[in-house]
């Protein structure tokens, strides 16, 4: 819902709708379990799952004997309401042995033993195969359960899991999302010591990890390691390093990699272009934004309203109202519907250069094309007109101007 420009100056009080999210009880069960809230020390020391990935670490005989003493009791008695509800939501398509482990995890209690003891007991009783491990991991990941990483690291050491390089890479990605650099590096080191090939996929995951964590030098060093593999780099490896350069505040280096990709006929993803364009745009680097915008089209990617909006914003921030207006009109000529955000950016560009007459002409053109002003564009006008102290005068002028334009010559 919007308003035409003549009424824009009187409407600035719209409120955003309240969005209420829903949460499944099955998911909440894991989050509310106090056993899942661990300190940094507990995470490193309380369970041997993490420690087992360290170099030279072996499972001692006394640990194995403790595992045998785990009290594997059938679940069903003395359940809380939440536990009972969570159990009923276990996917029926899971195998019986997987359902059994899920029930034990839901009702896990330290009085029965450690969590790794539980996994060891399940391993001996159920003789799981790789498909069972993967089924458990998938469900725990869907639940966003902290038990996921414990099961994942424990499974890597089990013959029945038949671990491969991608299993290690998934754990690196997991730690990357949490910015846990040391844990990811430990996983990579364990992977090397177990004889797995460190390939481009794994190193790209490390580049992403270092980039997100702000370790830009390590990201660049790892990217150079990928080049030393002697294999053609794919768009993911390039894209990860470009994102690292953007986060490091050197988009020029990222743009240089884009040109390198272009010379090898490798197309970056839309999100990479968008991130680079956004960086130039927010910094008011109109020339850089225009170069990236042109590169998007050369790559065969059709610009959408968000990409066009970033280009308009670059001109707006740098005070180039004429170019902002031109980019806006080109967007419309391309058949892209203008958003209120884009209209607001053009108005902001006019405000920065104090071009009131041009702004009024722009508003009249919008009204002629039946384009209504929304909350954001109206707010820009309100701020500008109040600063000038001409709210009522401008409203009257707009109406008179609009009326004169509609009369036949």
UniProtKB/Swiss-Prot annotation:
<feature type="repeat" description="PPR 2">
    <location>
        <begin position="199"/>
        <end position="233"/>
    </location>
</feature>
<feature type="repeat" description="PPR 4">
    <location>
        <begin position="269"/>
        <end position="303"/>
    </location>
</feature>
<keyword id="KW-0677">Repeat</keyword>
<comment type="similarity">
    <text>Belongs to the PPR family. P subfamily.</text>
</comment>
<protein>
    <recommendedName>
        <fullName>Pentatricopeptide repeat-containing protein At1g01970</fullName>
    </recommendedName>
</protein>
<dbReference type="Pfam" id="PF13812">
    <property type="entry name" value="PPR_3"/>
</dbReference>
<feature type="repeat" description="PPR 5">
    <location>
        <begin position="304"/>
        <end position="338"/>
    </location>
</feature>
<dbReference type="InterPro" id="IPR002885">
    <property type="entry name" value="Pentatricopeptide_rpt"/>
</dbReference>
<feature type="repeat" description="PPR 6">
    <location>
        <begin position="339"/>
        <end position="373"/>
    </location>
</feature>
<feature type="repeat" description="PPR 1">
    <location>
        <begin position="164"/>
        <end position="198"/>
    </location>
</feature>
<feature type="repeat" description="PPR 3">
    <location>
        <begin position="234"/>
        <end position="268"/>
    </location>
</feature>
<dbReference type="Pfam" id="PF01535">
    <property type="entry name" value="PPR"/>
</dbReference>
<dbReference type="InterPro" id="IPR011990">
    <property type="entry name" value="TPR-like_helical_dom_sf"/>
</dbReference>
